[in-house]
């Protein structure tokens, strides 16, 4: 795995050997393996760990483990502790979403304050498969199926080609130790249900699914780019500004192929959520309304008025 990791990083990333990289390290299997691999590959790291305090003593033990790992390898460890109440019970936001928001804000702070060239997370092929299946169940459209990217805005994911089983076997062979989060064993979250009961079936396929998935997602990503380019052209033809907002001309839109698909794509720019059927609004009587996350859409004869 070490050689494959090196080959992948050489091909995919262009990191400056003289500038540090921040490794997001929870203390779990994936981030511990990432830390050790990057220790051999780059050797100029800062470990960043966030303690949410959600698991009491176990959270503190995770923190202590990461601090010890950093000390053993000779790296600075930056730790942030947040009150559990700042993560739980946030209106309109799940615990996982809030934790992610806090975590990435912290990682960005560490990156900027240490003049690092990026943040590394331990997302791997199984995470990508789980995300694909979750988005498939949510009808997110092409964009949601294109998967986790190898890098986005200073966040790098060098373990993405590797399956969890490969990572585990490598860690066991090396004799690494890591922390286990008991909450990962429950079926309380959709991702865990997929991880425990659906993803294992993919490992029984004859062809390695991670390669097939990446190829499929590359095709979907290209299709999404083509669709977005076409949406931009259509938008310029059918959407005009008014004093109160925007005016979408349904008659002009109907001259294009698959107008309902285009309509949904155009309205996602204005807060349309998966599952909201803007096509029904287009067929409704004047005066019908649809409220997105950010806008009001009002049917007025042959147009839809879009107001913030």
Predicted features and spans:
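AMP-forming adenylation/ATP pyrophosphatase catalytic core
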Residues: 2-30, 46, 50, 82-84, ...
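Catalytic subdomain that performs nucleotidyl-dependent activation
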Residues: 118-122, 127-216, 246
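Amphipathic alpha-helical segments that form well-ordered structural scaffolds
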Residues: 65, 69, 106, 170, ...
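Short coil/loop linkers at secondary-structure junctions
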Residues: 14-16, 76, 117, 177, ...
């Amino acid at each position: 795995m070490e050689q494959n990791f090196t080959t992948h990083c050489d091909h995919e990333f262009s990191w400056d050997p003289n500038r540090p990289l921040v490794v997001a390290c929870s203390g779990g299997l994936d981030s511990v393996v990432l830390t050790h691999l990057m220790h051999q590959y780059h050797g100029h790291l800062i470990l960043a760990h966030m303690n949410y305090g959600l698991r009491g003593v176990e959270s503190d033990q995770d923190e202590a483990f990461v601090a010890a790992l950093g000390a053993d390898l000779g790296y600075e460890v930056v730790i942030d502790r947040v009150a559990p109440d700042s993560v739980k019970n946030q209106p309109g936001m799940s615990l996982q979403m809030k934790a992610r928001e806090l975590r990435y804000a912290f990682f960005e702070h560490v990156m900027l304050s240490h003049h690092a060239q990026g943040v590394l997370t331990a997302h791997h092929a199984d995470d990508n498969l789980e995300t694909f299946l979750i988005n498939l169940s949510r009808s997110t459209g092409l964009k949601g199926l294109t998967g986790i990217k190898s890098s986005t805005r200073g966040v790098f994911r060098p373990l993405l080609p590797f399956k969890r089983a490969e990572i585990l076997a490598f860690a066991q062979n090396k004799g690494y130790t890591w922390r286990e989060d008991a909450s990962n064993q429950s079926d309380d979250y959709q991702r865990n249900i997929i991880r425990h009961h659906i993803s294992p079936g993919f490992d029984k396929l004859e062809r390695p699914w991670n390669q097939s998935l990446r190829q499929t997602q590359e095709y979907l990503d290209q299709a999404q780019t083509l669709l977005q380019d076409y949406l931009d052209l259509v938008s310029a033809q059918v959407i005009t500004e008014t004093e109160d907002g925007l005016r979408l001309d349904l008659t002009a839109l109907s001259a294009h192929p698959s107008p309902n698909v285009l309509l949904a794509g155009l309205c996602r720019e204005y807060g349309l959520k998966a599952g909201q059927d803007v096509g029904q609004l287009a067929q409704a009587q004047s005066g019908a309304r649809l409220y997105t996350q950010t806008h009001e859409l009002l049917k007025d004869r042959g147009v839809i008025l879009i107001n913030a």
